[in-house]
């Protein structure tokens, strides 16, 4: 190129930005054709106005609307000419654009809004004066790699596909070290087409240019667009570097692309457009693995316990651990008396048989316990599917429920215990060993085949007992108290009967004595005695009737008269014997009377 538009080389290549997939936002159409039609597409008889694009091979210019600079504004305007590459320093090309006399460097993504002025905005803020595209194939400094170019202090982004028509710096252009801007297009100086074989991009594409968060907010950099049809990424250039780039600024008119050839769709670099991510294929929701944890396992809840991670936890050795032993624990439950009813046939078995059976059971338990590991060393692995939480284990110290006599024990974990044995620590142990006080009041616990545990009560200290576990007893003292009490009751009853009959007998004797004292003779007996005595004493005749009524009227007098004759009779023999030895006296008189 020449300075001021006098360069003999008019075949300089221009780098035109690709158009987006949607119509321009200002809704304007190009009006670069002469004739009466100021809007719309040209007709065959209309001659084009302004510069024509020429292919790189030196062919003739064409008026095809699909070929040319897209988005350029009016003819002769500095903002309507696409940026021209300038290979001044190295393969990292600087892009310059014509201005009204100033070859200022324009930064992509300038904070100046679209349509704010006719002149390009310089990117001279801070240590960086311009932006230059990074050659393809270089690693991005954002990934921890540095750019091989000189004076590059800011991170750069990857360039798009090089098939976009980026000109080769070795095309015989003038020395780009001059850093002069390209003159504006004139009717006698057409702008050549950099790549006639370049097809227009798909209108469905978009360019997103967000702010990359640099230290200086006035120099935003566009985001990488690795796909074809996108703008090349630019790298910041140091202030002392001669490689510069100029871009046309949008016009303040509502139609900045008027009188432009070809399609006028243009994407302004300063206006970032969000790109919506294509919705992916709807996937079914993932199955969330849920694992339960138990506070007794020493776990710390989800995320820190046994169920965290969804993977099976392993021991330090690396082997997966089985389920925790706490799930196999079945501590004791209260014993039910109705579960066991021994018979007297158990007494026939000797103590030796029971002791031998206990020894055999202990040996079996030791063999089973030999293959088990310590309870504290187990870590239950997390299952892939949710599992039902185990039922809360009963508290320790309570006896386990034992099966009823004659029934087989319920199998646990594909194993079962015989009658009289319970599962403890994943092994079968006898009830007599686990519960030392299974039999009360000094009873002895025995294991009977097919019947379970049996209690033999202490018959030496106690006379009677009751219950399957000797819980009810009767002592000798109790028997003695019952016997003494019964005897006392019988004696008391006999005493009461004796007293009763003795009193009755006493009353009978008293009444009988009274009857004897109050008994008198009858009047007839008294008359007969008085008559005989009176007649004998007085010498009266027994046939004396006048004296009879008088005796009946006075019954008390015969008593006195009776005593007098008795006394006379008792003294008469003595007097007769003394006075008259030969006479018989009163007895003789009685005999004579008789």
UniProtKB/Swiss-Prot annotation:
Annotated Low complexity bias: 140-181, 248-259
Main subcellular location: membrane
Stretch forming the signal peptide: 1-18
Gene that encodes the chain: CSPG5
Function: May function as a growth and differentiation factor involved in neuritogenesis and more particularly in neurite extension.
UniProt topological domain (Extracellular) ranges: 19-481
Post-translational modification remark: Different forms exist: the 140 kDa form (also reported as 130 kDa), which probably consists of the entire protein, and the 38 and 80 kDa forms, which are probably cleaved in their N-terminus. Increase in synaptic activity, results in shedding of the extracellular domain and expression at the cell surface of a 38 kDa form. A form of 200 kDa has also been reported, which is probably hyperglycosylated. N-glycosylated.
Chain spans, region Disordered: 1-325, 343-418, 535-594
Record's compositionally biased regions (Basic and acidic residues): 541-564
Annotated protein name in UniProt: Chondroitin sulfate proteoglycan 5
Cytoplasmic face of the membrane: 503-594
GO cellular component, one term: plasma membrane
Region Interaction with TNC and TNR, residue ranges: 338-377
UniProt note on tissues of expression: Expressed in astroglial and neuronal surfaces in different parts of the embryonic brain. Expressed in adult brain and retina (at protein level).
Pro residues bias: start-end ranges: 182-195, 219-229
Keywords assigned by UniProt, alphabetized: Cell membrane, Developmental protein, Differentiation, Disulfide bond, EGF-like domain, Glycoprotein, Growth regulation, Membrane, Neurogenesis, Proteoglycan, Signal, Transmembrane, Transmembrane helix
Domain EGF-like: 429-471
TM spans (from-to): 482-502
Lipid bilayer topology: Single-pass type I membrane protein
Biased composition (Polar residues): 1-12
Biased composition (Acidic residues): 349-375
Single Gene Ontology BP annotation: cell projection morphogenesis
């Amino acid at each position: 190129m020449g300075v001021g538009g006098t360069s003999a080389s008019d075949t300089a290549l221009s780098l035109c930005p690709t158009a987006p997939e949607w119509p321009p936002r200002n809704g304007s159409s190009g009006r670069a054709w002469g004739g009466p039609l100021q809007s719309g597409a040209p007709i065959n008889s209309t001659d084009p106005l302004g510069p024509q694009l020429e292919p790189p091979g030196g062919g003739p210019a064409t008026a095809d609307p699909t070929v040319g600079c897209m988005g350029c504004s009016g003819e002769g305007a500095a903002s309507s000419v696409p940026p021209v590459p300038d290979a001044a320093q190295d393969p990292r090309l600087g892009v310059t654009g014509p201005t009204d006399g100033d070859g200022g460097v324009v930064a992509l993504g300038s904070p100046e809004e679209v349509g704010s002025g006719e002149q390009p905005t310089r990117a001279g803020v801070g240590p960086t004066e311009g932006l230059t595209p990074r050659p393809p194939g270089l690693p991005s400094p954002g990934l921890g790699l540095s750019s091989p170019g000189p004076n590059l202090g800011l991170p750069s982004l990857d360039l798009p596909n090089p098939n976009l028509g980026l000109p080769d710096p070795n095309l015989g252009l003038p020395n780009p070290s001059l850093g002069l801007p390209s003159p504006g297009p004139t009717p006698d100086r057409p702008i050549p087409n950099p790549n006639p074989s370049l097809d227009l991009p798909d209108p469905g594409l978009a360019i997103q240019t967000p702010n990359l968060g640099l230290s200086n907010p006035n120099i935003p950099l566009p985001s990488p667009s690795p796909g074809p049809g996108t703008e090349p990424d630019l790298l910041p250039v140091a202030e002392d570097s001669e490689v510069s780039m100029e871009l046309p600024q949008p016009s303040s008119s509502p139609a900045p692309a008027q009188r432009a050839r070809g399609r006028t769709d243009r994407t302004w670099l300063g206006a970032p457009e969000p790109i919506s991510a294509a919705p992916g294929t709807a996937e079914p929701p993932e199955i969330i693995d849920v694992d339960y944890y138990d506070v007794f396992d020493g776990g710390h809840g989800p995320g820190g316990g046994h169920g965290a991670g969804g993977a099976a936890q392993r021991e330090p050795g690396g082997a997966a651990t089985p389920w925790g032993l706490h799930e196999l624990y079945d501590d004791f439950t209260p014993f039910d008396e109705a579960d066991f009813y021994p018979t007297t046939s158990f007494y026939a078995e000797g103590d030796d048989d029971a002791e031998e059976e206990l020894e055999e059971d202990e040996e079996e338990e030791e063999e089973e316990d030999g293959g088990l590991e310590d309870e504290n060393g187990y870590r239950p692995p997390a299952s892939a599917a949710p599992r039902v939480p185990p039922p809360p284990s009963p508290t320790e110290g309570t006896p386990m429920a034992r099966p009823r006599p004659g029934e087989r024990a319920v199998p646990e974990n594909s194993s079962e215990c015989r009658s009289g044995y319970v599962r403890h620590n994943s092994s079968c142990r006898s009830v007599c060993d686990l519960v030392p006080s299974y039999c009360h009041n000094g009873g002895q616990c025995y294991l009977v085949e097919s019947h379970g545990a049996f209690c033999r009560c202490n018959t030496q200290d106690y006379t009677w007992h009751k219950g399957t576990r000797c819980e009810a007893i009767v002592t000798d003292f109790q028997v003695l108290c019952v016997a003494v009490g019964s005897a006392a009751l019988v004696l008391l009853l006999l005493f009461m009967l004796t007293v009763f009959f003795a009193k009755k007998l006493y009353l009978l004797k008293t009444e009988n004595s009274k009857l004897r004292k109050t008994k008198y003779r009858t009047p007839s007996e008294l008359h007969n005695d008085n008559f005989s005595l009176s007649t004998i004493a007085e010498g009266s005749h027994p046939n004396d009737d006048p004296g009879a009524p008088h005796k009946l009227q006075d019954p008390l007098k015969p008593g006195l008269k009776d005593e007098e004759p008795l006394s006379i009779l008792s003294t008469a023999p003595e007097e007769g014997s003394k006075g008259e030895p030969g006479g018989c006296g009163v007895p003789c008189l009685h005999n004579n009377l008789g």
